[in-house]
């Protein structure tokens, strides 16, 4: 059985927790539904373990944590880690009711060289207060605000040979603006 969020288009990935619309299911809600469906169908829908040993396996992946770390997006990584933690909480509630029949394994698959936010032996500051002001992921920014930023320059006249609407970085935008002001 594969549970798919009904609001996702085609095979799209879930959005980061920080970007998730109210209509989308959280990882915890998907975990809750999976447990209810798999356990509730046992033994004629009575939700009790039988002696035949029929059990079930659920894998819940907080895969967007890794995506956020690759993007160096601290708040998206933190938000999706908390989202995954909430899903684990749902599984733990099931465990509390069925401790002899339940095994929960939580592991990281390859997020071992991720980003560093501050370091104890340097003067680098983490600016956590600024992180709390972040309202969406870098991916959301890139897909939405950056496109609007580029569109604002689409009709700009510029002495350089660059088409401002094709720029893909703020550095390139700055260089274009500097060359236009010369």
Residue ranges and their predicted role:
Residues 1-182:
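A post-motif C-terminal structural segment
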């Amino acid at each position: 059985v594969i549970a798919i969020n009904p609001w996702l288009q085609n095979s799209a990935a879930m959005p980061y927790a920080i970007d998730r619309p109210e209509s989308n299911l959280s990882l915890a809600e998907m975990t809750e539904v999976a447990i209810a469906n798999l356990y509730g169908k046992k033994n004629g829908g009575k939700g009790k373990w039988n002696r035949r040993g029929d059990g079930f396996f659920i894998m819940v992946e907080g895969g967007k944590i890794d995506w956020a770390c690759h993007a160096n997006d601290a708040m998206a990584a933190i938000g999706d880690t908390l989202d995954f933690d909430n899903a684990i909480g749902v599984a733990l509630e099931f465990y509390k009711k069925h401790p002899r029949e339940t095994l929960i394994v939580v592991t990281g698959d390859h997020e071992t060289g991720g980003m560093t936010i501050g370091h104890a032996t340097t003067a680098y500051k983490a600016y956590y207060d600024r992180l709390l002001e972040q309202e969406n992921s870098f991916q959301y920014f890139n897909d939405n605000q950056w496109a609007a930023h580029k569109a604002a320059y689409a009709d700009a006249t510029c002495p350089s040979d660059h088409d401002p609407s094709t720029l893909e970085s703020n550095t390139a935008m700055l260089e274009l603006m500097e060359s236009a002001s010369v």
